[in-house]
């Protein structure tokens, strides 16, 4: 199985936000939200010296994505196909899943409930509910521009990066550019509590990587809190649906 991933080279990133702007333009992302973001970190003192860098973030398309297990949508059987070999596999999935052939995490907007459970479950804050999609909104996030890569194009953020700081490819291919960065020491953003295998990695000076790791610690919402959020949102949808049906009956 391939595992698509991305390297962010912090030695090259200039914090211009062109990647985030390109993503918004490509996917019509609301102004207040972002599939991609760039945050300034520092200057701050670390154990490795004074550091100042940027945190370009996006969905990590994790090995064991917390968002997938959090989705409450009824599962259905779906057929997945490998772009290269043509091999097929049938899996039962909810409204979000990890593709068995390319390792990306995707969303079925038609079946998404808009409850936001997946967004709450993501330890990286990489998901949000887009209020412009459907009556109740739909979950949205970076897809690694799967529609673009399917026809041989790079993700919009990679193509637009002025400094060449974003590198996209197959991490499972030892000869790929992304795999070479891993060999050189590109790191994952994880923590003692969160080890779900993010497939976006960061490369740079040791002090900058230290600042990044200390500033951007992934956190998983406690299950009890997640359940409360989910139940509250689902209850809101049920009440709204009931009111709508009552009005239809009244005027029907």
What are these regions (language model features)?
Residues 1-252:
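Non-ligating segments of multi-cofactor redox enzymes
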């Amino acid at each position: 199985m391939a595992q698509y991933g991305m390297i962010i080279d912090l030695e090259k990133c200039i914090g211009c936000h062109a990647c985030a702007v390109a993503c918004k333009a490509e996917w019509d992302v609301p102004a207040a939200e972002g599939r991609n973001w760039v945050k300034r970190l520092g200057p701050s003192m670390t154990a490795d010296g004074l550091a100042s860098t940027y945190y370009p973030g996006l969905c990590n398309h994790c090995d064991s994505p917390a968002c997938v297990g959090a989705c409450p949508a009824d599962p259905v059987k779906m057929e997945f196909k490998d772009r290269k070999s043509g091999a097929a596999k049938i899996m039962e999935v909810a409204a979000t899943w990890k593709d068995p052939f390319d390792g990306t995490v995707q969303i079925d907007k038609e079946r998404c409930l808009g409850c936001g459970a997946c967004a709450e479950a993501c330890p990286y804050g990489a998901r949000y509910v887009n209020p412009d999609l459907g009556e109740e909104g739909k979950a949205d996030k970076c897809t690694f521009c799967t529609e673009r890569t399917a026809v041989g194009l790079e993700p919009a953020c990679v193509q637009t990066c002025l400094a060449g700081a974003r590198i996209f490819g197959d991490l499972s291919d030892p000869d790929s550019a992304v795999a070479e960065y891993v060999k050189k020491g590109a790191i994952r953003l994880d923590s003692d509590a969160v080890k779900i295998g993010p497939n976006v990695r960061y490369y740079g000076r040791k002090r900058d990587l230290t600042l990044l790791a200390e500033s951007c610690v992934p956190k998983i919402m406690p299950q009890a809190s997640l359940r409360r959020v989910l139940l509250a949102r689902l209850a809101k949808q049920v009440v709204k649906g009931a009111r709508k049906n009552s009005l239809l009956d009244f005027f029907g």
